[in-house]
UniProtKB/Swiss-Prot annotation:
Cell location: Nucleus; Chromosome
Stretches the record annotates as Required for interaction with HIRA: 155-204
Post-translational changes noted in the entry: Phosphorylated by TLK1 and TLK2. Highly phosphorylated in S-phase and at lower levels in M-phase. TLK2-mediated phosphorylation at Ser-192 prevents proteasome-dependent degradation. Phosphorylation at Ser-192 by PRKDC in response to DNA damage promotes the histone chaperone activity and ability to replace histones at double-strand breaks (DSBs) at stalled or collapsed replication forks, leading to RAD51 recruitment.
An example Gene Ontology biological process: DNA repair
Disruption of the gene: reported phenotype: Embryonic lethality at mid-gestation (9.5 dpc).
Protein name: Histone chaperone ASF1A
Gene3D superfamilies for the chain: Histone chaperone ASF1-like
Keyword Glycoprotein recorded: no
Keywords of the record: Chaperone, Chromatin regulator, Chromosome, DNA damage, Nucleus, Phosphoprotein, Transcription, Transcription regulation
Keyword Nucleotide-binding among UniProt keywords: no
Phosphoserine PTM sites in chain numbering: 192
Amino acid sequence: MAKVQVNNVVVLDNPSPFYNPFQFEITFECIEDLSEDLEWKIIYVGSAESEEYDQVLDSVLVGPVPAGRHMFVFQADAPNAGLIPDADAVGVTVVLITCTYRGQEFIRVGYYVNNEYTETELRENPPVKPDFSKLQRNILASNPRVTRFHINWEDNTEKLEDAESSNPNLQSLLSTDALPSASKGWSTSENSLNVMLESHMDCM
């Protein structure tokens, strides 16, 4: 059983100009004390064509975390516009929130993001070179995709090592290489949940 449940994610300051920071209010619950930190990341998918354009906007360690309910606001700077292909600057992309424990990702929350010009003239005649200062970012907060992964939560790693040697498939299940990429990981996963709410996500 997972020792951490993400109860709620609220998208703050949305919509907002492209260069404004991303802000998410995250509420999670631990069923028991965690001896090590949780690592949270915000990842911006620069292009659906290749994960090489994914940008980790910020990473924060939270912990050690006592049992109970906790809430924090996770803020990250906007992506580096110079690393985004011109063809992918305007339109729909994805932002991901991930959390790992002992280097193992156990949850991923993905949101569609629509970047568009607010001025009619720019929408009808967009410049060849994108003007990011004129773009507005709108996160589809009402329709997150939530993907969960089974990990080893125990302090005793010997137990997992024994299981790996007796079951060679277990290592591949827990390997980060086996996890879906940020660009493609939650689009068709049968473990994904569509959660429909007006302004926030409530994990089931």
